[in-house]
Every structure is written in structure tokens, then in C-alpha cells.
């Protein structure tokens, strides 16, 4: 099952590869994503543990997933989705609303409307964050852009069923790791913002500076729970390997933002538990 949103740094396309390195089924009963984002890896996992916790500090992303798990909120969200039109003008207005309207966690209707506007802006933007997306390819006798959005809307009921038992929170991801890291029945998949030393620009609404990355690494190194981390290789993360984490590298084929240039990137995984797979790069 694919994520309902496109997300910078999201792992939809790598999910099956990453899942190969998950701990054995039954070796944990609580699964946590402290930097939830698109939740792309978990949505591809056929082995669902008893407890799943999705967390994201971004109010827009949190609002969407909070709405998707709640029965009443989802029903209202679906009503809005059924009336949708694919419009650059609507996208511009919704984007402005997301900037100007204060986040109110105590107002369910407000969260639903924020969730819908974020969903709309995301699905009508190139790669979820660029300009208005117009794809001239034809699918189902319409623009591929419209077809993709309608397909996502049609899949929302199944997505709601899948997410209905997920616990959704809106807090600092590092604090969440710290809260659960000493429990041996917990497995944390951490996909934090790429370290700033590995990129030239900021595309995250909620980023992490070098000090926060150090705190994140501290908590991971001292954890008793199972942890799997994904990201780009960098000097700061060498401390993970120095403290017993296994590192795995694999090449990811991506397209540039304009969909014209192919790029190969090397993604890394770090884990503090043993894996049966042999392609381990120490």
C-alpha cells in the first residue's frame, strides 16, 4: 500500500528493500516511527505488530494522519475529497491558508480542514513540494496528474482501515525515542531529516540542526531497543558504527525535480541488531 502523500526523503520506493532488514516478526510488539513523514515503509509491511506509533512534528502532516485514523474525522475528510477539482487557483488559496490559519489541535474540524488542504496541495505539487503539477500524459482519458490524484482518493477507505489502530502523535521525535529506547520489546525505524552536511538546501518544514543530530545519535547509541536508521553517509553517523551498529549501503535510482535527469544516490541503513542478510558493508 502506497502512502497518500509525496514526501521529500520519503521511502516509498525503497520500502521493500528496507523491510528486508527489519527484525524478525515476533521479536518486538511495538513499532515506532519518530519521524513519520509519509509512513511509506510501514504501509508496505505485511507483518503488522500489535502496537504502531506514528509521530511527526509537522502540524500539516500530523493533521493528515490524525484524520486518516479517526473514523468521524475521516468521514468528513472523504466528503471534502469527493467534491475535489484539480485547480491551480484552489491550490494557491489552500497553500496560503496553511501558512496563515493557526493550528488548533483541540478543534477536530479544524484539523480535518488542515489535513484536506495539505493533502490537496501535496498531491497537486511536483514531487509534493514543487510547483503546480501538470502531466500531459493521458491515463483513464484524463491527465495523468488528475488520474493519480483520483486513484489516491479512491484508495483512501483501504488506507483508513489499515491505519485505524495506529497511534498518531505530534511531538519532538528525539524525545519520543528517548521515552521508549530502554524497552527491549520496542523496534524504532528512524528516518530523520538528512544530515545538513549531505545536502545543499532545506526542503523540510521541520529540520534538524547539527546539535539535534548529535542528540539523536546519543539516544540511538544508548538504546536497549532495536533501532534501524536510514540516511546518507556522513562523518557524524560514524559514531553509530563505532558503537556496534551495522551499516548497509545500497544505490537508489532517482529523478531530478524536473523529471529530466537521472541521478544515483547511495542510501545507508544502520542497525543495532544482527541481520541474516549477507550484503553488509562494515
Where are these regions (language model features)?
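S-adenosyl-L-methionine
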Residues: 1-35, 40-41, 47, 260
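Conserved SAM/SAH-binding beta-strand->alpha-helix loop
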Residues: 58
Amino acid at each position: 500500500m502506497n502512502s497518500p502523500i509525496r514526501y521529500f526523503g520519503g521511502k516509498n520506493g525503497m520500502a521493500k528493500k528496507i523491510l528486508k532488514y527489519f527484525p524478525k516478526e515476533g521479536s518486538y510488539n511495538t513499532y515506532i516511527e519518530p519521524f513519520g513523514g509519509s509512513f511509506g515503509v510501514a504501509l508496505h509491511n505485511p507483518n503488522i505488530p500489535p502496537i504502531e506509533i506514528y509521530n511527526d512534528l509537522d502540524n500539516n502532516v500530523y493533521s493528515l494522519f490524525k484524520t486518516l485514523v479517526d473514523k468521524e474525522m475521516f468521514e468528513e475528510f472523504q466528503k471534502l475529497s469527493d467534491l475535489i477539482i484539480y485547480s491551480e487557483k484552489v491550490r494557491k488559496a489552500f497553500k496560503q491558508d496553511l501558512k496563515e490559519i493557526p493550528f488548533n489541535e483541540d478543534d477536530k474540524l479544524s484539523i480535518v480542514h488542515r489535513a484536506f488542504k495539505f493533502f490537496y496541495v501535496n498531491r497537486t505539487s511536483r514531487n509534493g513540494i514543487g510547483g503546480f503539477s501538470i502531466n500531459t500524459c493521458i491515463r483513464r482519458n484524463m491527465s495523468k496528474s488528475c488520474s493519480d490524484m483520483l486513484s489516491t482518493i479512491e484508495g483512501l477507505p483501504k488506507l483508513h482501515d489499515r491505519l485505524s489502530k495506529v497511534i498518531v502523535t505530534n511531538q519532538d521525535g528525539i524525545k519520543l525515542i528517548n521515552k521508549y529506547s530502554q524497552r527491549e520489546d520496542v523496534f524504532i525505524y528512524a528516518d530523520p531529516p538528512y544530515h545538513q552536511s549531505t545536502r545543499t538546501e532545506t526542503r523540510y518544514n521541520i529540520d534538524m540542526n547539527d546539535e539535534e543530530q548529535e542528540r539523536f545519535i546519543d539516544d540511538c547509541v544508548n538504546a536497549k531497543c532495536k533501532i534501524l536508521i536510514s540516511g546518507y553517509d556522513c562523518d557524524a553517523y560514524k559514531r553509530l558504527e563505532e558503537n556496534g551498529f551495522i551499516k548497509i549501503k545500497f544505490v537508489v535510482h532517482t529523478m531530478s525535480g524536473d523529471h529530466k535527469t537521472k541521478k544515483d544516490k547511495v542510501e545507508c541503513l544502520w542497525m543495532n541488531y544482527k541481520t541474516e542478510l549477507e550484503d553488509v558493508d562494515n
